[in-house]
């Protein structure tokens, strides 16, 4: 045996492999899907390079894309490079090409109708690419709420008057009197505004992400957090829990107070709406739950603000107790929602009572919710998150066409002075994502949320919460096994109008109060109709309209007259 020949053969093989390795190049592509890399040699045909790129992008046909070696350049179509190799095009290791989808792209797509449950417009129509969702140039085409369309046309700049620091004439402007952006932190602190409005937040992110002078590089400013593990990882390993990698596992979660809120203010159209709702507790001592129906309007007390105007509270079937509520099956839910839709009303939130008499016999109640206890309990936070998930906010500023929710939670409880007062809240987008991923659950301590452990297909990443300590420094704390619910809460203001102009009247028996002896029947309807002064105002009662539709004695044309 000739060991020298074997050694020489081994050296030749090594040099051949090493030479081929040195010829291998990496060509980078900046695509709408992100940065992608393709291996090639100088002799590789550019068409083969594009085939590998198409596989990574999930695109079988790249004829609708252009390629350029300069950003923001129109570039050339893929057909231009037919028959050319990497060397012919002068491409070297590490070179980058910019890939742009042409405006006249006709990639195969199907149109899916996504029904929005009750919170925004009825239907969202959005093209969905069968090969995967591709970011588009410009805002997503969806049907938003009217208030969102109105606020999208406003810049929200905060005007300031000429101050003592100004040294110019009446027609001049300087840094002390120039308009402020709608998200200005100093303005919020000066005026006691805890959270910026949703549209101010969108404008702030747009300012950071998008160049208003270059519409072709548009990036949607909003993206909902997703803490689910990806069970279809592109790396090729077995799905979790059999396999996991950095591409499919969710990132580390850091919770902090949300800077913005989807709704800034809750306005009850008339105090009688809330009084009728609280009367159940006043007469029986049991708690009550209801769905608030109303509309969304511009709120001018906050830059680009939104307020929810509550016109009625519908009480679904429930079993009330002195310390809680059990919701029962709601058989006519779809009918109630259809009636509300006919009346141009939305389910804007829920309301529930948590009242305990103080025993002083002066009408005061105990103050159980304050900064030293909790404002919403852990179970109520989970409930609010689930309702918000069921009522998504439709927006053109997100690739998915959805972002968080405008659904609010109002709890009627005791104030610091023993008075009965409503308090309105929402939970953050992080709370919604944590509930979707089944990461959090309730605990025996109302002010704390418990973090679940990884089990089955549920993967729980590291969770931290960030707060400012007594020295003004930001400190991160491990959230496991439990963390305060305050990090998921968003507070709203609420009030009654000074000059109320409610859409509906009061007086008809409210539904599902049989246990109080208040029945919705023909006798109650007869008494209510006879109490009408003769101007038909009795038809302006939400509970009565729902009862009429439930009876089924009116035809479609007659019901339409009632709705009108």
From Swiss-Prot:
Pfam families named in the record: NPL4, UN_NPL4, zf-NPL4
GO molecular function: K48-linked polyubiquitin modification-dependent protein binding; ubiquitin binding; ubiquitin protein ligase binding
Gene Ontology annotations for the cellular component aspect, listed alphabetically: Cdc48p-Npl4p-Vms1p AAA ATPase complex; Doa10p ubiquitin ligase complex; Hrd1p ubiquitin ligase ERAD-L complex; nuclear membrane; perinuclear region of cytoplasm; replisome; RQC complex; VCP-NPL4-UFD1 AAA ATPase complex
Keywords attached to this entry: Cytoplasm, Endoplasmic reticulum, Membrane, mRNA transport, Nucleus, Protein transport, Translocation, Transport
Membrane topology reported for the UniProt record: Peripheral membrane protein
Localization (cell): Cytoplasm, Perinuclear region; Endoplasmic reticulum membrane; Nucleus membrane
UniProt superkingdom: Eukaryota
Biological processes per GO annotation: cytoplasm protein quality control by the ubiquitin-proteasome system; DNA replication termination; endosome to plasma membrane protein transport; mitochondria-associated ubiquitin-dependent protein catabolic process; mitotic spindle disassembly; mRNA transport; nonfunctional rRNA decay; positive regulation of protein localization to nucleus
MPN domain span: 266-403
Job of this protein: Involved in the import of nuclear-targeted proteins into the nucleus and the export of poly(A) RNA out of the nucleus. Has a role in the endoplasmic reticulum-associated degradation (ERAD) pathway.
PANTHER family referenced in this protein's UniProt entry, alphabetically: NUCLEAR PROTEIN LOCALIZATION 4, NUCLEAR PROTEIN LOCALIZATION PROTEIN 4 HOMOLOG
The family this protein is said to belong to: Belongs to the NPL4 family.
Protein name, per record: Nuclear protein localization protein 4
Originating organism: Meyerozyma guilliermondii (strain ATCC 6260 / CBS 566 / DSM 6381 / JCM 1539 / NBRC 10279 / NRRL Y-324)
């Amino acid at each position: 045996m000739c060991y020298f020949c074997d050694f020489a053969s081994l050296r030749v093989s090594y040099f051949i492999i090493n030479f081929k390795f040195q010829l291998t190049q990496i060509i980078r592509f900046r695509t709408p899907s992100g940065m992608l890399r393709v291996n090639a040699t100088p002799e590789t045909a550019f068409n083969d390079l594009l085939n590998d790129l198409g596989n990574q992008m999930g695109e079988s046909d790249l004829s609708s894309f252009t390629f350029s070696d300069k950003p923001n350049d129109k570039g050339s179509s893929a057909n231009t490079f037919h028959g050319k190799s990497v060397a012919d095009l002068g491409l070297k290791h590490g070179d980058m090409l910019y890939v742009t989808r042409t405006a006249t792209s006709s990639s195969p797509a199907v149109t899916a109708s996504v029904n929005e449950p009750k919170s925004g417009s009825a239907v969202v129509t959005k093209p969905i690419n069968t090969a995967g969702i591709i970011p588009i140039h410009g805002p997503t085409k969806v049907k938003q709420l009217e208030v969102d369309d109105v606020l999208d046309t406003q810049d929200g700049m905060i005007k300031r008057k000429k101050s003592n620091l100004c040294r110019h004439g009446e027609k001049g402007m300087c840094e002390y009197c120039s308009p402020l952006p709608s998200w200005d932190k100093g303005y919020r602190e000066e005026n006691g505004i805890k959270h910026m409005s949703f549209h101010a937040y969108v404008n702030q992110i747009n300012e950071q992400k998008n160049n208003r002078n270059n519409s072709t590089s548009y990036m949607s400013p909003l993206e909902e957090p997703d803490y689910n593990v990806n069970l279809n990882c592109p790396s090729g390993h077995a799905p979790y829990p059999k396999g996991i990698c950095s591409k499919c596992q969710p990132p580390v979660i850091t919770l902090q107070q949300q800077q913005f809120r989807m709704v800034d203010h809750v306005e009850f159209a008339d105090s009688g709406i809330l009084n009728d709702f609280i009367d159940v507790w006043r007469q029986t001592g049991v708690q009550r739950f209801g769905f608030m129906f109303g509309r969304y309007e511009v709120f001018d007390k906050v830059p680009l603000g939104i307020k929810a105007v509550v016109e009625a509270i519908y009480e679904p079937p429930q079993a009330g107790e002195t310390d809680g509520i059990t919701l029962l099956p709601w058989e006519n839910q779809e009918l109630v929602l259809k009636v509300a839709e006919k009346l141009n009303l939305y389910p804007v939130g829920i309301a529930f009572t948590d009242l305990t008499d103080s025993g002083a016999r002066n009408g005061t109640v105990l103050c159980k919710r304050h900064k030293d206890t909790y404002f919403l309990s852990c179970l109520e936070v989970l409930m609010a998150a689930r309702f918000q998930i069921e009522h998504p906010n439709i927006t053109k500023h997100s690739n998915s066409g959805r972002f968080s929710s405008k659904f609010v939670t109002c709890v009627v409880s005791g104030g610091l002075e023993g008075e009965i007062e409503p308090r309105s809240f929402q939970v953050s987008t992080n709370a919604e994502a944590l509930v979707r991923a089944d990461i959090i659950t309730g605990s025996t301590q109302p002010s704390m949320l418990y973090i679940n452990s990884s089990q089955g297909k549920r993967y729980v990443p590291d969770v931290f919460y960030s707060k400012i300590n007594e020295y003004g420094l930001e400190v991160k704390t491990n959230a496991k096994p439990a963390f305060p619910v305050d990090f998921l809460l968003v507070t709203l203001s609420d009030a009654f109008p000074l000059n109320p102009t409610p859409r509906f009247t009061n007086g008809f028996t409210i539904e599902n109060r049989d246990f109080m002896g208040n029945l919705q029947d023909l006798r109650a309807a007869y008494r209510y109709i006879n109490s009408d002064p003769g101007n038909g105002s009795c038809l302006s009662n939400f509970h009565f309209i729902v009862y009429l539709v439930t009876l089924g004695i009116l035809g479609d044309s007659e019901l339409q007259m009632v709705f009108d």
